[in-house]
Amino acid sequence: MTRIKINARRIFSLLIPFFFFTSVHAEQTAAPATPVTVEAKNETFAPQHPDQYLSWKATSEQSERVDALAEDPRLVILWAGYPFSRDYNKPRGHAFAVTDVRETLRTGAPKNAEDGPLPMACWSCKSPDVARLIQKDGEDGYFHGKWARGGPEIVNNLGCADCHNTASPEFAKGKPELTLSRPYAARAMEAIGKPFEKAGRFDQQSMVCGQCHVEYYFDGKNKAVKFPWDDGMKVENMEQYYDKIAFSDWTNSLSKTPMLKAQHPEYETWTAGIHGKNNVTCIDCHMPKVQNAEGKLYTDHKIGNPFDNFAQTCANCHTQDKAALQKVVAERKQSINDLKIKVEDQLVHAHFEAKAALDAGATEAEMKPIQDDIRHAQWRWDLAIASHGIHMHAPEEGLRMLGTAMDKAADARTKLARLLATKGITHEIQIPDISTKEKAQQAIGLNMEQIKAEKQDFIKTVIPQWEEQARKNGLLSQ
């Protein structure tokens, strides 16, 4: 059994990531009375913090794009009617934050600032320009409008001012000066009894990452970011919260179920696991202390896999060698993936069977308990797998969530079988060929050729205009 020596690990972290995603409370502020002090151009701080800057810049080496839909075409069906069915890649280095949100098919191909499918909030975990705009315009001013409105303004990749108070004298002296640059994140931490200003250094390290690596949703007319933590951080607590406010991200185009889309709940799952319970922070594992050429220690800002720096991360707490721990992690990952696939198979059938019931004349009242089960099953599945490190952060919680998802999906299918029988349908509902991403997308009626062509035109014509405008306004150095 893995043994963690908590006292062995306090040799880490000074400066913290230039990254991490987004979310929380939707009470927005008016335009600020204070001047804008956020400097979003990351290279500004290279002379003060050269080692940290160069290691942050090295996240550009994490450039591989992995197509999650091609790996698992079932996802296309589960997200039918939602932009994720078009395009979903596994995360790359933080140096690609702005590029990837611009180029994903999910953000569409807007032609002007009022065009496109998504709100401004979709920028919120991509750039220190977000913190700059919130300081400049207030939260109401920032969140207002469509995603395309932010194109000429949000141009610098996740960096220094996302996690540090770069305007402070302490930061200039080389101290980390951690900060929550997103006010909605600060409110969320307060909601769970963790006000940032009163937190210790190790708590603050993970809270800074938790500005973005969390579950969130878009609330109100302005689609402002909010974390669903009012009733707690467990999957059932958030499910209860969403049900209470009758929130849904979209309606599945097959089953007509009002669905929830989990984001990237690393903070929640880390909190539920052995590392979180012992306050082994994100920084301890993903941003260890390393030596520069002169032998000086600094915090490595090339956020990555702990096994890449085994001696500076895992070995500070664990007695096992690298190969032994890699074997443990691989086994946990395989166990979670095996159950994940089984849940997905059940959900795919449930969506198509629900469609068959609707086509056969099932009423809204007849479908409601079935759709509730589908909604809850997929939510629990999604929260378990949307956190890419669940097998390390909280494998037991991941398996528990997937187990309850399987139960809910089975309940939905049992009810569907009974309902279909009342409509005279007793044969098995056939599933179309979804063996590839392309076939699955065709099965839900996506015209991918048109979608891709429109996106390529957007990339060639609109993005260069955004960058030109940003340079004219002094928001980009080059």
Swiss-Prot record:
EC number, as in UniProt: 1.7.2.2
Pfam families: Cytochrom_C552
Metabolic or biological pathway: Nitrogen metabolism; nitrate reduction (assimilation)
UniProt-annotated binding residues for heme c 4: C282, C285, H286, H393
Cleavable signal peptide: 1-26
Amino-acid positions noted as binding heme c 3 in the UniProt annotation, renumbered to this chain: H94, C209, C212, H213
Alphabetical keyword list: Calcium, Electron transport, Heme, Iron, Metal-binding, Oxidoreductase, Periplasm, Signal, Transport
Catalytic activity of the protein: 6 Fe(III)-[cytochrome c] + NH4(+) + 2 H2O = 6 Fe(II)-[cytochrome c] + nitrite + 8 H(+)
Required cofactor names: Ca(2+); heme c
Chain sites annotated for binding heme c 5: H275, C314, C317, H318
Positions that bind heme: C122, C125, K126
Binding site for substrate: Y216, H264
A Gene Ontology biological process term: nitrate assimilation
Residues the entry annotates as binding heme c 2: C160, C163, H164, H301
Protein's job: Catalyzes the reduction of nitrite to ammonia, consuming six electrons in the process.
Protein name (record): Cytochrome c-552
Classification lineage: Bacteria, Pseudomonadati, Pseudomonadota, Gammaproteobacteria, Enterobacterales
Gene that encodes it: nrfA
